[in-house]
Amino acid sequence: MFSAAMLARRATTATKAHARALSSNLGCFPGTKMPFVPEMVFRDPRDDDLIPCSRILNEEGDIVEGAQDPELGRDICTQIYSNMIRLNTMDNIFYDAQRQGRISFYMTSYGEEAISFGSAAALRLSDMVFAQYREPGVLMWRGFTLQNFADQCFGNKEGHGKGRQMPVHYGSKSLNYQTISSPLATQLPQAAGAAYAFKLAKEDRIAVSYFGEGAASEGDFHAALNFASTKDCPILYFCRNNGFAISTPTVDQFRGDGIASRGSGYGIPIMRVDGNDFLAVYEATRRAREFILQENRPVLIEAMSYRQGHHSTSDDSTQYRAVAEIKHWKETCDPIDRTKRYLIKRGWLTEEQDRHMQDNERTNVLAALQQAEAVGPPDLDTMFEDVYDVKPPHLIVRLSALFFCYAKLTES
């Protein structure tokens, strides 16, 4: 509740502002200012200029004219590339493992590797990540190992999810990466709330919420951006616009200039970036983080990309797009190939080193897969853990009943 004195001060301030606006022919309605005009004209957003797409690196691995190389240095750039190879190799092998019936479900990140690693490299480990399901690269960059990924996908007793989560619902408390949820867009308002808490606690960190353009069609997207804007939350909303929401292309999802334009409607600074250019993604994220902490305001980045893989192992994308289209994007705009060309031209990578790196990652992924497969499932009694500090009586009864039924079944 506001005190009478506070309400009186607000009323006085509002009255004076309204009087000043009227004297200068401005409409000072609550919450906004705009000029009065005599014309009665509809504004058509199709007449406005499109938001440009920023890039630093072209498809050939060259710095584009007028752009400035952020000069990340050899170590960071080669680390980004090696992580791209690791994720791509893991995707290949884990996808095949699902087809062989060894794991139940999987989702790849083909074509979106630069988004994950370019942005992750510009964040701090203290920044809290609220991801969707296409950002395992962010978690990998933070230190989640191949064995961690494999254990989670097999749902074994070593996995952080203890066999209770879907395979690709990764998470890590120690790495500040919130566990993924199946429902789309739930992470967006959660991230806004976390960012608001950081602000109240005066912590020097931000929240980062990744999502696809399909998730931006959910109501949670709008609620989250409105909350983040009105509360001036230190949060980066990072949209991966990869062209498809499962089988629905963007042309059937929305009208208007993509997702970035929606940020303007909520008073949020925006940037659109080439999501296949790891340097541009890095620099956009770095600048966004710096702005967010300095201005205490949210930022929305839209990274344009193309989903080269199927939505998941439950999908066959050739039913709604041509194989030739996928092949074209793979051959002309692949982010891994672009990064490789840049490194070779800088003298930081050779073809021989690249082959050795790929062979080494394949060996490591296969070893992690085999080790995870050899580990047994979680014990039955773990189903009743991690909710209560001390098990209540009714759960103890149910646990006993479970073991009784299990014993009966195994006897027969």
PLM ranges: what are they?
Residues F2, M6-L7, A11-R134, V375, ...:
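N-terminal amphipathic, basic-rich helices that act as targeting or association modules
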Residues I93-A97, W348-E351, E373-T382:
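Surface-exposed helix-capping loop/turn segments at secondary-structure junctions
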Residues T89-N92, D96-K231, D252-R255, A260, ...:
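Cofactor-binding active-site loop characterized by glycine-rich and histidine/acidic residues
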Residues A374-S412:
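C-terminal intrinsically disordered, low-complexity extensions immediately downstream
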